[in-house]
Amino acid sequence: MNKIDFSYASKSEHNLAQRLIIKTIETITGKKKLEKLYKSYSINTRKPIDFWSDIIKILDIKILNNSSYPLTIPSEGPLIVIANHPFGIIDGLILCSLVSERRSDFKIMTHETLKFLPELEKFILPVDFSNKNRETKKQNIETATKAKHHLNDNGALIIFPSGSVSTAKDLKSNAQDDEWKLFPAKLIHQTKSDVLPIFFDGKNGLLFHLFASKLKNQTLKYSTYIHETKKKLAKKYQFTQAK
């Protein structure tokens, strides 16, 4: 089995020094734990669609529906799932797990670095949020086109409209998404897709918000995503389905 590099360090977004900082902090704060869990998971061959329910069990995550009615996910037809993005990795895993219980024809638009897991490649439509050069802009345009085609083929698509993890204005405030992008609304209009809005309760820890909001340091913020994921093992997560 090839060694998997659990890291948010991206050659397209970060220079060598930034990648070194991110990888060092990740290694110190949780990377080895996640790699160990993945290694134990990947020993046995499994169906790709089972990855989502399996990983929720391995991470010992409990998912609680706070809605006054059962979660309703159409089993067929174009569907866009939109949600706030308070955690980074865990909320994406939860959404994919929930959708996978009803259908296998779904994809998630998410950070391109998450393709480091081979099990995710089939499901990910990669986005480079730096959008800072011709190559990354081209990739993002291709991803947007693929997303539209996928919906036109009656697939399901998971999107975090903010395009970034929720942050708090100061260390005592609740975390909020950045302003939502117009792209999901355009997709809904163009593809006539059903929409499933989800709201997650919670936020990341003090260190993340210190780096993201107080210091406004993107490199240090990225370095905490693995740590935040490790911290969230064996915990309960609540969501509400909006009408």
Q: What are the functions of these language-model segments?
A:
Residues 1-82, 92-94, 101-105:
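Membrane-anchoring hydrophobic helices of lipid-metabolizing enzymes
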Residues 92-94, 119-121, 162, 168-173, ...:
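A short secondary-structure junction signal
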Residues 98, 149, 186-187:
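Hydrophobic/aromatic ligand-binding patch that stacks against planar heteroaromatic rings
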Residues 143-153:
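Short amphipathic alpha-helices and their capping/turn segments at secondary-structure boundaries
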Residues 153-164:
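A structural motif
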Residues 156, 168-243:
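A cross-family acyltransferase "interaction/gating" segment
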